[in-house]
Amino acid sequence: MSKRTFQPNNRRRAKTHGFRLRMRTRAGRAILATRRSKGRARLSA
């Protein structure tokens, strides 16, 4: 039997999808801008 692929880990989650990571690149900032304009309650992890 294969293991479950999702092994929750908050630190890894933030490091991969976090706000500061999004702010680091131009593309990431574009993602945030899109989510802001859409009115998302959560911008990032």
UniProtKB/Swiss-Prot annotation:
<dbReference type="GO" id="GO:0005840">
    <property type="term" value="C:ribosome"/>
</dbReference>
<comment type="similarity">
    <text>Belongs to the bacterial ribosomal protein bL34 family.</text>
</comment>
<dbReference type="GO" id="GO:1990904">
    <property type="term" value="C:ribonucleoprotein complex"/>
</dbReference>
<dbReference type="Pfam" id="PF00468">
    <property type="entry name" value="Ribosomal_L34"/>
</dbReference>
<dbReference type="GO" id="GO:0003735">
    <property type="term" value="F:structural constituent of ribosome"/>
</dbReference>
<dbReference type="InterPro" id="IPR000271">
    <property type="entry name" value="Ribosomal_bL34"/>
</dbReference>
<keyword id="KW-0687">Ribonucleoprotein</keyword>
<keyword id="KW-0689">Ribosomal protein</keyword>
<protein>
    <recommendedName>
        <fullName>Large ribosomal subunit protein bL34</fullName>
    </recommendedName>
</protein>
<dbReference type="GO" id="GO:0006412">
    <property type="term" value="P:translation"/>
</dbReference>
<dbReference type="InterPro" id="IPR020939">
    <property type="entry name" value="Ribosomal_bL34_CS"/>
</dbReference>
